[in-house]
């Protein structure tokens, strides 16, 4: 019995020892599994040039609620996932001409959608400065995302200062550079530096720019020694992004905007990405950082945003609220926003880069619609700045697409004017090439051999002859560039015909004229 007891004690000691060994081994394995391996991945969801919060093309493409879903799904796999807006989101938008709670909406719907969708970082685009100073400051204060502004500043009566977000009475100036610290599950940490660069295109009086490339170099020099990677978020032409990559080859990545069609480029080791406008796609970019080897690898994937992606419920609820607000406004003006007006055909080109220098199929359609609305006119004119969509309209085209293309609307006026005034107007149009004051006009009016000598129906414009002209009411205010002379009291205007306000008359709103014209086209 004593011998049996002794053997049992030995077995117990052996089992206890074995248990301790196993426990230590498991603990050590667990520690090894969670030890810092020096590697960390960071995801960016890039969108840019987004003017529409809801899906387009009959609900097939785009939609901020779908972008929100893309980010949330990536977050489930990697908590180091961030959404970036590379400029142009407050304007142009049809909402900017509408009122809610007594004030013009002016991008309020977009900031709310961006907040709900989970945008983390944003920079200015040139169109942010289309709205006035107080409106922009209000949108900034409503935003819950971080702004980075390296070369764009607030011109005030007291001098040039950073733009700032004011919360609870405290102003938080926008940073010229920003360092994001990220950490993964095994404890690897990394620092990513950012700069935000905007092309100096919009010269609003409350904006001041510094030289983009010089500023970028200064920002990079400030960031490079304290960060594992430096990223430039930009809003400029692809050619300028390529030049930036050439000038600063140490950049890890350029997240860009401004062009409305997707762009991808590589200059040296610098990857450049831009998504399609209006969230028809999002670029998914992964920075793979190896801190041990001091290496940065970039992988990219273009994610089309379409009806195969479910809408995030929170974001979608906000979008539907604003859609309802918009539709009530449109209905009061005689529009059925969701009605399809053109089911098929070639996409309509309303890009500013095209319509402010030449005619497109969209501008031709608008001119034909104006002529149909004013059949007795000798000539029709519209300033290209009236067309604000800055995009290509894909089929099907709805009434809403027409509304958002010409958000300011306005009536078609008819006036009799002397040929001398018409010649002066057309000379100003040539001077305005590249800006909104460049005119679109009837094809019967020809600039003979590009000389500035104009003919109508093959006959030279007679300075003393009176011509009946149909034109947008804005042109008659003298507010267009180099056309301050074009006002109702100009002595060379012989007659102004009564303005038509009845919505049954296509001349009451140029958008109604376009919709009516399209409805009469043969399929």
Which ranges hold each PLM region?
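C-terminal motif of bacterial Sec signal peptides marking the signal peptidase cleavage site
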Residues: 23-25
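Leucine-biased recognition of intrinsically disordered, low-complexity hydrophobic segments
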Residues: 1-3
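Catalytic centers of hydrolytic enzymes
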Residues: 32-41, 52-55, 68-72, 76, ...
């Amino acid at each position: 019995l004593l011998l049996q007891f002794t053997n049992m004690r030995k077995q117990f000691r052996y089992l206890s020892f074995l248990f301790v060994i196993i426990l230590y081994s498991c603990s050590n394995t667990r520690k090894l599994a969670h030890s810092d391996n020096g590697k960390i991945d960071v995801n960016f969801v890039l969108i840019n040039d987004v003017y529409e919060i809801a899906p387009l093309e009959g609900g097939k493409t785009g939609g901020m609620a779908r972008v929100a879903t893309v980010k949330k799904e990536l977050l489930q796999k990697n908590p180091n996932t961030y959404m970036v807006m590379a400029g142009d989101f407050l304007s142009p938008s049809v909402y900017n001409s509408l009122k809610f709670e007594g004030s013009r909406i002016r991008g309020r719907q977009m900031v709310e959608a961006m907040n709900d969708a989970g945008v983390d970082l944003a920079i200015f685009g040139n169109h942010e400065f289309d709205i006035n100073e107080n409106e922009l400051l209000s949108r900034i204060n409503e935003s819950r995302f971080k702004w980075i502004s390296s070369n764009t500043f607030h011109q005030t009566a007291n001098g040039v200062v950073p733009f700032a977000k004011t919360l609870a009475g405290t102003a938080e100036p926008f940073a010229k550079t920003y360092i994001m610290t990220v950490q993964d599950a095994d404890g690897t940490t990394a620092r990513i530096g950012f700069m935000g660069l905007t092309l100096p295109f919009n010269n609003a009086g409350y904006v001041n720019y510094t030289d983009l490339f010089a500023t970028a170099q200064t920002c990079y020099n400030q960031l490079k020694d304290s960060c594992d990677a430096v990223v430039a978020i930009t809003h400029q032409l692809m050619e300028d992004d390529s030049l930036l990559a050439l000038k600063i080859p140490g950049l890890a990545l350029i997240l860009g905007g401004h062009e409305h069609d997707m762009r991808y480029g590589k200059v040296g080791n610098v990857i450049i990405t831009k998504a399609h406008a209006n969230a028809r796609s999002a670029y998914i970019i992964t920075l793979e950082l190896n801190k041990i080897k001091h290496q940065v690898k970039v992988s990219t994937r273009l994610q089309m945003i379409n009806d195969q992606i479910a809408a995030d419920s929170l974001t979608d609820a906000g979008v539907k609220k604003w859609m309802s607000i918009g539709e009530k406004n449109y209905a009061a003006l005689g529009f059925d926003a969701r009605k399809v007006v053109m089911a098929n055909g070639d996409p309509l080109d309303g890009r500013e880069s095209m319509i402010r220098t030449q005619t497109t199929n969209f501008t031709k359609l608008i001119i034909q619609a104006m002529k149909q609305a004013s059949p007795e006119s000798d000539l029709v004119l519209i300033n290209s700045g009236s067309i604000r969509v800055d995009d290509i309209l894909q089929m099907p085209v709805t009434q809403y697409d027409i509304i958002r293309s010409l958000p300011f609307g306005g009536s078609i006026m008819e006036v009799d004017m002397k040929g001398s005034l018409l010649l002066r107007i057309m000379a100003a149009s040539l001077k305005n090439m590249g800006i909104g004051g460049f005119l679109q006009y009837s094809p019967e009016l020809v600039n003979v051999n590009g000389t500035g000598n104009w003919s109508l129906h093959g006959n030279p414009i007679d300075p003393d002859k009176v011509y009946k002209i149909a034109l947008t009411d804005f042109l008659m205010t003298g507010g267009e560039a180099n056309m301050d002379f074009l006002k109702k009291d100009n002595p060379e205007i012989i007659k102004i015909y009564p303005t038509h306000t009845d919505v049954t008359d296509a001349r009451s709103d140029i958008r109604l004229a376009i919709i009516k014209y399209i409805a009469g086209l043969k399929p």
